[in-house]
Amino acid sequence: MENTELIKSKAFNVIEVIEYIPNSVVIRSIIKRITGNISAISFDSGELLHGKISPFETFIQIIEGNAEVVIDDKPIFLKTGQSIIIPAHTRTTIKANEKFKMLSTFIKSGYEEVS
C-alpha cells in the first residue's frame, strides 16, 4: 500500500486504511507535517520495532489486537482501545506477540531538547 495521506473531508475507517503483510511492519501516514504526524501501523505476529529513542512524546492507541510496549525495559501490555503516552527520551520497543494495528501520533512543539 502506498504511503500517501488520506483524502481530506472524506470519512474512513482507520482499521481499514492499513493491511497486514506477512513478516512485516507496515506504516501508512494519515497526516504528515513538519510539526508532527499521525500514522496507522500494522504489525504481523512476531514483528517488532526496537530501541527507538525519540525527542518527542508519542501517543499510541491500539485499534485492533494486543500489543506489548516496552518503555525503558518495563513491559506494558495494551489491548484494543487502550492507549499510552510514551515519554520523550525513553528507549521504546513495540512487540507483536500477535498481529495488531495501532495509531501513532506525535506533535513537535519546537521546544524539545533534541540531542
How should these model regions be labeled?
Residues 37, 66-68, 75, 91, ...:
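Structural motif
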Residues 24, 37-54:
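Conserved short histidine dyad/triad with adjacent acidic residue
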Residues 63-64, 79-80, 98:
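A cytosolic small-molecule/anion-sensing beta-strand core signal
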Residues 42-44, 54-69:
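Short, conserved beta-strand element in jelly-roll/cupin
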Residues 88-112:
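Ligand-binding loop in jelly-roll beta-barrel domains
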Residues 49-51, 69-70, 86, 91-97:
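Short beta-strand His + acidic residue motifs that chelate non-heme Fe in jelly-roll/DSBH
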Residues 1-35:
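A short, N-terminal "cap"/entry segment at the start of jelly-roll beta-barrel domains
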Residues 73-88:
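Short acidic-glycine-tyrosine-enriched beta hairpin
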